[in-house]
Amino acid sequence: MRSVEVTIDIKAPRDVVLREISEYSHPPVLHKSVIKSVQVLEDKNNVSIALWRLKVLGFTRTARQKQIVMPPDKMTNETIGGFARGTLESTFLYETGEGTKIVDRIEIRVPKWGKLLEIPIALYTRRMTEGILMEHKKDLESRYG
């Protein structure tokens, strides 16, 4: 298992940031180079399960994720099926004087046959997560910053 951590500051209120990063309708639009589609299978209270089609290392992969939103300052995404099953992303949001600080920690799990790919996948995941968070930053700061 490998872990990666990405930190970013966004000049927008914490509740708005949490709502935006946990929302399913914008990823295929805002992050279209990586996320091909999202289909929500279940959505009850702050727990949802969705089927994602993602572009990973040039290949389109499918993953089923369980998302738990814990307002006002935490969200988790666990891959429960498909590519990278067992991967856990924990997102923490902290209020700052200028907006919100996001700390995104991802514990990457790959199948035993994929151990040689663990480091490249970790590096790719870090770069992909930074890109997605930067897209959120640009979008939110254009509206709130």
Residue ranges of each PLM-predicted region?
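Hydrophobic ligand-binding cavity/cleft-lining segments
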Residues: 1-45
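Glycine-rich portal/gate segments that line the openings of hydrophobic small-molecule binding cavities
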Residues: 38-84, 134-143
